[in-house]
């Protein structure tokens, strides 16, 4: 299997980045729902689940940057034949997925009120503690962290977390299955090992 993308298939790196990101997004939901459904506030279990969620979010952010860099250096395989409208819908869907892959970790980091204990190995300071926050947000706009955090929390938790991510990921998965079973083309094979 080729490391780089070819005209017909995604390479190993693109596949690992795709499925790794998907797995981490799922893990991020598992940790946050575990925290809300099975732990009490101010308990060690709640804190552990929160720190795992934050750590996974930071990892997703790094992987997404790597995905974008890899995509720029290594173009995607050519699309399967289809109507112009289908091609536009696929491109719009992918741009929307990349947007949420950037926005979810970014709004999560910017809006968190605690340091991230990155997989309990080292600390990543919360944005509120950085000089950038002091200079731009407090100094530049004259707003407190609470005022800054409120819209970020809404975007991260309600808009993205509860709605948009699920809608886009479900649409992406259904489109892949439609290509596989409805159109019977190679779209799904390109991102797997070809044995579906």
Language-model features, listed with the residues they occupy:
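Membrane-embedded alpha-helical bundles that constitute the cytochrome b-like, heme-associated redox core
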Residues: 1-196
């Amino acid at each position: 299997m080729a490391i780089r993308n070819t005209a017909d298939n995604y390479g190993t790196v693109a596949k690992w980045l795709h499925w790794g990101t998907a797995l981490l997004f799922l893990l991020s939901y598992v940790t946050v729902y575990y925290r809300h459904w099975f732990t009490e506030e101010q308990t060690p279990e709640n804190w552990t689940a929160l720190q795992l969620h934050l750590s996974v979010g930071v990892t997703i952010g790094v992987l997404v940057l790597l995905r974008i860099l890899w995509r720029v250096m290594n173009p995607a395989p050519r699309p399967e034949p289809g109507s112009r409208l289908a091609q536009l819908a696929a491109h719009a869907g992918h741009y929307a997925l990349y947007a949420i892959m950037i926005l979810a970790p970014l709004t999560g980091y910017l809006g968190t009120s605690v340091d991230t204990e990155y997989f309990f190995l080292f600390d990543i300071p919360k944005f509120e503690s950085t000089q950038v926050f002091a200079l731009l947000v407090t100094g530049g706009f004259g707003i407190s962290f609470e005022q800054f955090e409120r819209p970020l929390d809404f975007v991260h938790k309600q808009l993205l977390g509860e709605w948009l991510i699920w809608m886009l990921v479900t649409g992406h998965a259904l489109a892949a299955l439609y290509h596989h079973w409805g159109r019977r083309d190679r779209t799904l094979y390109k991102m797997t090992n070809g044995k579906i």
